[in-house]
Design a protein with these regions (language model features):
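Membrane-embedded alpha-helical signal segments
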Residues: 1-205
Length: 205
């Protein structure tokens, strides 16, 4: 296999993540937290209380490793979405939504189409836990709107809209979301400049 990530753990130390506004520093070995790229320090356990008092977030070595492993899997999960995995997911969905699966597969939604939809969502970091909503949206988009099955981009656009709560939750912190707005005229220009090519939508400015 090929290496996709690496990191280093100092088992006799704790990892202290630096706060945004460091007022006091603690002694330690400077490093970068591997999962999110946060400036950090490996500190001795006896310095834990001091680090936390200064605003550092202190993490055990095992938690660092598990976090790095989890984030690495998330970033590359789209590469793991094989045809066999799609079949397994559909078989599990049949247990909770048998009528939907009977209508959708394989007459309207092919396993190949669902694989492409799920892969695109995972590549964007969107959770596919709500598989029933994803499949139902694909089914409705294709059967009711008469959308060509080959137009995966438009199908995924409909799925994103159906997963709006899941997606917005990803960017919320304590129930609040930070946003950036642009001038309405610029927004219209960008929307009107959207073009569709072989590789999906792009801005033709």
């Amino acid at each position: 296999g090929e290496e996709i990530a690496r990191g280093e753990i100092l088992v006799d130390y704790l990892l202290a993540l630096e706060p945004d506004d460091v007022e006091e520093s603690v002694d330690g070995i400077e490093t970068i937290e591997p999962a999110y790229g946060i400036p950090s320090k490996w500190i001795r356990p006896e310095n834990r209380d001091k680090a936390e008092m200064y605003g550092y977030t202190v993490i055990e070595p095992l938690a660092v490793m598990l976090s790095h492993l989890s984030e690495t899997i998330k970033r590359h999960s789209h590469e793991l979405m094989s045809r066999q995995e799609v079949v397994r997911l559909v078989e599990n969905l049949k247990k909770t939504a048998p009528e939907l699966c009977e209508e959708a597969f394989p007459g309207v939604i092919s396993y190949n189409l669902l694989q492409r939809v799920l892969t695109m969502l995972l590549r964007e970091g969107i959770s596919i836990k709500d598989l029933e909503t994803i499949v139902e949206t694909c089914f409705e988009t294709i059967s009711e709107n008469g959308l060509p099955v080959k137009d995966v981009d438009q199908i995924v656009e409909k799925v994103r809209a159906a997963l709006k709560r899941t997606i917005t939750r990803m960017y919320c912190e304590d129930g609040n979301m930070k946003v950036v707005t642009i001038d309405a005229a610029l927004e219209r220009t960008m929307v009107n400049s959207l073009s569709r090519g072989e590789n999906g939508m792009y801005l033709a400015l």
